[in-house]
Curated annotation (Swiss-Prot):
GO biological process, any: arginine catabolic process to glutamate
Organism in which the protein naturally occurs: Shewanella sp. (strain MR-7)
Molecular function GO terms recorded: hydrolase activity, acting on ester bonds; succinylglutamate desuccinylase activity; zinc ion binding
Name of the top EC class for this enzyme: hydrolase
Its biological purpose: Transforms N(2)-succinylglutamate into succinate and glutamate.
Protein name stated in the entry: Succinylglutamate desuccinylase
Amino acid sequence: MLQALLDSKDFLALTLANPETLGDEFSFALGEHTRVEVWDTGVIVFEPAQAQGKDVILSCGVHGNETAPIELCNTLIKQLLQQKIIAKQRTLFLIGNPLAINNGTRIIDENMNRLFSGEHSNPPGLVNPERVRAKKLEAYVDRFFKGAAAGRQRIHYDLHTAMRASKHEKFAIYPYRPGRAYSAEQIMFLAASGVDTVLFHHEPTTTFSYFSSEQYGADAFTIELGKVYPMGQNDMTRFIAAQEMFMRLITDKPLALEPFSADKVNLYQVCRVINKHFDDFEFTFATDVENFRSFPKGFVLAREGGQEIKVEQEFEAIVFPNAKVPIGNRTVICLIPSVAPDVR
């Protein structure tokens, strides 16, 4: 495995050729500046000899068909392995769901991004590949963050693409973080990366980014970088800004961020999440409606069990509508403009 990686510098190819395991862990040096550790398939760490003050996680492929972030991360990994760029911050790359990537599908059995914060082991337990992998990914995050001295800034960007078009092509979900202000620096880093829209979540979830935020105090985000396309069919020029900013972060180059200003970004607050309670749940709008479509108060969004679900606020925008989820799961997130969020 080691020689294959040294020869190809293609960690994604190695991962997809061995989607369940690489066998034993292995490590090697890049010159005298970086130690590389491979902990598992899809799990690679870059440890600088003289690390600066940040611990950075870039995860992708939690959903197997969201290919642009996978290609973006593999490009960064390849540049690091080729020593075209040199890591100055401790960096962990996670390719989340290799089996689903090989399958060309979002999932194998279950949505992995609902299985963190221990949800993987709740009934029915570790019964499918996503549950087993989510538990392992949690352990790798724990090992990485605890593998350095306390007091370092912890960052986790969980990279995705959405199943539908969007009024705002690139957007981020800021996990619920009671008692902690939102980071102005992080919001402006996202804006510089081309991610000009942020959703402030209103409650705990079982997503990967919430896990890192809640368990480790990380500045963590679920970042949607555009629309789903098959592997190799992404227009990677649309991700130049994101790739550049991630490279600058990892290599400790100046970020040159603008000061925070609410008029430079689109800020939304999650006002509610609508879950499915009956098999007959259906939306009233077209199946191809774009994310962030806004509806007025009183508009019937959906029907189920003989009841109508209406817009409650003056206007509510929607993201991630999906009526074909299991009972008990989220069908849509409803948003309102965020007024005076605690951003510092």
